[in-house]
């Protein structure tokens, strides 16, 4: 059984360690360090509308989901910026369980819409589709190196 807590600044070091472990492994194969991951998570945690939860299985950190809310003319949209499940916990439904709890908590905050970005064509895309997300046909993601 999972237990949850809202993310606080004191949690960021342990979350950064899990982040490095998760995203430096396949399918991402990134090159995060504890310092760069800590900076990224701290930047998000300092946002005015930041919200996130971390999940524990038998008192061991096993996942997190976090982001921030944005006001639009027709309501509040929550942007999930990071969602990860410890590598040793993946593949047994923990990610879906964490997401369902997070969504329940967002609804309690009167947030009705969630969006995120993920890599196309890998297990993450399938995970989000399985949890009710769909590709937005009206929006595109653009980038430019400067």
Describe the predicted segments one by one.
Residues 70-80, 90, 136-138:
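A conserved beta-turn-beta hairpin within the catalytic core of GNAT-like acetyltransferases
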Residues 115-125, 143-146:
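Conserved beta-strand-loop-alpha-helix junction that forms the acyl-donor binding cleft
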Residues 2-17:
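A short beta-loop-alpha structural element at the N-terminal edge
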Residues 54, 60-69, 79, 84:
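Conserved beta-strand in the GNAT
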Residues 19, 128-129, 133:
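Conserved active-site tyrosine of GNAT-family acetyltransferases
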Residues 20-42, 50:
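Conserved GNAT-fold acetyl-CoA-binding loop/helix
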Residues 85, 91-104, 130:
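Conserved acetyl-CoA-binding loop-helix of GNAT-fold acetyltransferases
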Residues 99, 106-119:
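Conserved GNAT acetyl-CoA-binding A-motif
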């Amino acid at each position: 059984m999972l237990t949850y807590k809202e993310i606080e600044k004191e949690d960021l070091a342990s979350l950064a360690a899990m982040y490095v472990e998760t995203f430096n492994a396949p399918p991402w194969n990134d090159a995060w360090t504890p310092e760069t991951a800590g900076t990224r998570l701290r930047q998000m945690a300092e946002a005015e509308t930041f919200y996130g939860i971390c999940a524990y299985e038998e008192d061991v950190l096993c996942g997190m989901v976090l982001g921030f809310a944005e006001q639009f003319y027709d309501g509040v949209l929550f942007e999930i910026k990071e969602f990860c499940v410890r590598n040793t916990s993946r593949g047994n439904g923990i990610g879906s369980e964490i997401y369902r709890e997070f969504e329940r908590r967002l609804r309690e905050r009167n947030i009705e819409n969630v969006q995120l970005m993920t890599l196309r064509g890998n297990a993450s895309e399938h995970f989000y589709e399985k949890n009710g997300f769909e590709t937005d046909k009206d929006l595109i993601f653009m980038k430019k190196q400067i």
